[in-house]
């Protein structure tokens, strides 16, 4: 054996032994007597190597005092010291090396949830009780960190580096049946790695972690060869082979330095939000077929999603206490990201426990004063909604959360009645409310009538204008914004969403290409059917309308009565048939008693009376708890507005109200009263339209007159 070969042998042994981490607990620990025999058998064994440049001395006595015999054998096997040098060189030459290795000075963005100077800390909480309700206090970082890293196990790394025993979180993306490709990920306290496994033996792995605490490599590679980017704290490394690169060249088409910059330079919540947008876009645009995993877009998304979780956990190591509401925001946004991934991929599993934060969030939610949310700042509203989201599975929180969410949506709805538009921050808060209500309402066996108000208000904000704007967004944006594309329609009690219906709602313009119409219609339709989880099951009258569930267009639960808009009448209800004015479809309005008691006035359809010139009432709110509904003679139901207070009433019936500003004589308006009475509204909105038509006709006649005078002048001259 040459000196070079001896040197490589001892180098491998030293590296394996020096970097070995002792598992807890030891596995297959030999009895004390056997260990004593082994120690006596090896206590004179010394291994020395000295080539004049470096010297190595291994004392078996010291080694076996700390490493059990069977594990020592496993170390020897994994070190593979008898491997021919030719094989080692071949593996080295076949190791894939990125074209560049970029170093970016600095530490990158901080994920730390630092405590403000005015905050306080809580190290223990008895009976899960805390003070305050916005999470403005610090909690021990170690308590949260210990919950994440509870599972001590071996980390197997597809032969890139030595097996390590450490704390680890695992995730897997793949198919419900054993198949390739799959994506596996592993998060440890110091690093993470994500692998796309093409076969049992071929994989592409990205590793990200603290530069000085990366796992020990095997002898044929060094980090300088495979590192793609780094800063003063973290490194990003790629593991693969040139042989695999040749087989899956498309999967390697990404800029590793650009990915690293995106990770370290994007603010934390923005980075997580961008990942939510990216996942949503992949789901709507590209689909979530398991074969798309080999696409670099999907693989890089999965890698960045795992990095986001790692960086949030890693922030716990930098401080003794963390601010609860700050960390709760991270947890709620990461949870939503995982929910998006779960709804997309055929098989998705991510071990990410957060019971400590969940428990503290519930304790804070239970302290929330009644009707306080609308008086809070935007950031405090966000903090409260994050606490509700994390604690929504606690049955004790349900009543508090629903009460505050009703106030919040009512506040948003009143502001909406002025402009008929929603801001990005309002859509985000509606999304938070949607997440909370979705879980709570479907778990409640009995639903109170007042708890249905968010669904009525959401139905009111799901107007033709809202649908048209969303169709444009889905049709024209390359990256879909998960907040901007969230619609009140997902919380509505509308059930008439078909592709044909959506096409009629698309804004009419010669500037809109057919491709945009197709993208918009398909995207919004797909999202509606994924996100619109509102069910008739939450309605108290479900037992008397269940047989007509497929015929229902809209349900409007009011305080004293529930209106059901459908293509067939609801038995034992007060019926208004408006089908005689339709050209293509039919629509029947049924007023159903909330206790499902039969209507005593007979089964014959009632005629809808007409009133004219509805104006804003000067005093009081006579239309409160009523609904104004619009429908088209050709396309059927269009929009509705529920009148909650005098502000909404005034905005609805004002002269410039967008609700009555369609300018289409084929659109009719009905008022559905809280006592079961339905009336048709005609008046100012039609008078304005008639006046507009008269002005147009006069203008046309004026132009014709000018033209005739011009022709006469030409003829005479």
Swiss-Prot record:
The Gene Ontology CC terms held by the record are: host cell endosome membrane; host cell plasma membrane; membrane; viral envelope; virion membrane
What are the entry keywords? Fusion of virus membrane with host cell membrane, Fusion of virus membrane with host membrane, Glycoprotein, Host cell membrane, Host endosome, Host membrane, Membrane, Sialic acid, Signal, Transmembrane, Transmembrane helix, Viral envelope protein, Viral penetration into host cytoplasm, Virion, Virus entry into host cell
The segments labelled Interaction with gL in the record are 177-239
The answer to whether keyword Glycoprotein applies is: yes
- Report the leader peptide range: 1-18
Q: Which residues are glycosylated?
A: 43, 59, 80, 128, 444, 560, 613, 675
Which pairs of Cys residues are joined through disulfide bonds in the record? none
Membrane topology is: Single-pass type I membrane protein
- In what way is this protein post-translationally modified? N-glycosylated, O-glycosylated, and sialylated.
Which residue spans belong to the Virion surface compartment? 19-693
Which residue ranges are assigned to the Intravirion compartment in the record's topology? 715-717
Complexes and interactors:
Interacts with glycoprotein L (gL); this interaction is necessary for the correct processing and cell surface expression of gH. The heterodimer gH/gL seems to interact with gB trimers during fusion.
Record function comment: The heterodimer glycoprotein H-glycoprotein L is required for the fusion of viral and plasma membranes leading to virus entry into the host cell. Following initial binding to host receptor, membrane fusion is mediated by the fusion machinery composed of gB and the heterodimer gH/gL. May also be involved in the fusion between the virion envelope and the outer nuclear membrane during virion morphogenesis.
Under the heading HAMAP family, the entry gives: HSV_GH (MF_04033)
Q: Tell me what this protein is called.
A: Envelope glycoprotein H
Q: Which species is this record about?
A: Saimiriine herpesvirus 2 (strain 11)
Q: Which gene encodes it?
A: gH
């Amino acid at each position: 054996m040459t000196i070079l070969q001896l040197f490589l042998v001892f180098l491998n042994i030293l590296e394996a032994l020096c970097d070995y981490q002792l598992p807890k607990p030891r596995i297959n620990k030999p009895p004390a007597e056997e260990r004593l025999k082994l120690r006596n058998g090896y206590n004179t064994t010394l291994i020395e190597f000295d080539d004049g440049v470096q010297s190595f001395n291994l004392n078996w006595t010291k080694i076996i005092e700390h490493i059990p015999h069977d594990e020592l054998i496993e170390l020897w096997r994994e070190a593979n010291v008898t491997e021919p040098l030719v094989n080692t060189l071949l593996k080295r030459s076949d190791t894939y090396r990125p074209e560049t290795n970029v170093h970016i000075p600095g530490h990158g963005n901080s994920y730390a949830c630092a405590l403000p100077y005015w905050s306080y800390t809580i190290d223990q909480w008895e009976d899960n009780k805390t003070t305050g309700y916005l999470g403005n206090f610090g909690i021990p970082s170690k308590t949260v960190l210990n919950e994440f890293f509870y599972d001590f196990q071996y980390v197997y790394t597809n032969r890139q580096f030595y097996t390590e025993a450490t704390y680890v979180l695992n995730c897997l993306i793949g198919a419900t049946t054993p198949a390739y490709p799959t994506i596996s990920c592993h998060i440890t306290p110091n690093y993470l790695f994500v692998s796309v496994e093409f076969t049992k033996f071929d994989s592409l792995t990205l590793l990200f972690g603290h530069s000085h605490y990366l796992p020990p490599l095997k002898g044929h590679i060094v980090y300088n060869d495979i590192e793609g980017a780094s800063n003063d704290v973290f490194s990003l490394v790629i593991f693969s082979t040139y042989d695999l690169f040749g087989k899956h060249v498309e999967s390697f088409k990404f800029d590793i330095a650009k990915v690293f910059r995106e990770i370290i330079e994007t603010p934390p919540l923005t980075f997580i939000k961008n990942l939510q947008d990216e996942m949503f876009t992949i789901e709507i645009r590209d689909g979530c077929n398991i074969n798309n995993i080999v696409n670099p877009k999907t693989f890089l998304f999965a890698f960045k999603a795992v990095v986001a979780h790692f960086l949030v956990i890693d922030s716990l190591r930098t401080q003794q206490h963390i601010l609860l509401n700050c960390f709760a925001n991270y947890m709620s946004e990461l949870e939503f990201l995982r929910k998006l991934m779960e709804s997309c991929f055929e098989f998705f599993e991510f071990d990410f426990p957060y019971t400590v934060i969940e428990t503290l969030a519930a304790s804070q939610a239970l302290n929330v004063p009644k009707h306080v949310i609308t008086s809070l700042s935007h950031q405090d509203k966000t903090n409260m909604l994050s606490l509700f989201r994390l604690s929504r599975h606690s049955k004790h929180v349900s009543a508090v959360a629903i009460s505050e969410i009703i106030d919040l949506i009512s506040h948003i709805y009143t502001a909406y009645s002025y402009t008929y538009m929603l801001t990005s921050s309002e859509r985000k808060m509606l999304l938070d409310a949607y997440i909370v209500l979705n879980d709570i309402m479907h778990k409640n066996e009995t639903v109170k009538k007042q708890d249905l108000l968010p669904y009525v208000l959401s139905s009111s904000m799901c107007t033709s204008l809202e649908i048209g704007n969303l169709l444009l967004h889905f049709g024209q944006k390359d990256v879909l914004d998960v907040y901007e594309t969230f619609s009140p329609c997902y919380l509505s009690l509308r059930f008439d969403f078909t592709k044909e219906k959506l096409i009629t709602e698309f804004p009419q313009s010669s500037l809109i290409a057919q491709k945009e119409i197709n993208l918009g219609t398909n995207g919004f339709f797909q999202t509606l059917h994924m996100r619109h989880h509102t069910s008739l099951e939450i309605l108290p009258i479900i037992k008397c309308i269940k047989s007509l569930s497929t015929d229902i267009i809209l349900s409007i639960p009011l305080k004293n009565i529930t209106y059901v808009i459908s293509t067939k009448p609801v038995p034992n209800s007060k019926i208004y048939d408006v089908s005689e004015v339709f050209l293509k479809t039919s629509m029947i309005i049924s007023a159903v008693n909330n206790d499902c008691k039969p209507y005593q006035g007979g089964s014959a359809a009632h005629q809808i009376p007409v009133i004219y010139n509805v104006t804003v009432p000067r005093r009081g709110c006579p239309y409160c708890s009523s609904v104004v509904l619009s429908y088209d003679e050709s396309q059927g139901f269009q929009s509705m507005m529920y009148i909650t207070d005098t502000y909404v009433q005034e905005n609805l019936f004002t002269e410039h109200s967008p609700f009555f500003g369609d300018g289409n004589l084929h659109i009719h308006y009905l008022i559905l009263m809280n006592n079961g009475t339905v009336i048709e509204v005609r008046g100012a909105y039609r008078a304005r339209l008639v006046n507009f038509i008269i002005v147009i006709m006069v203008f046309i006649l004026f132009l014709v007159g000018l033209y005739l005078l011009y022709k006469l002048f030409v003829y005479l001259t």
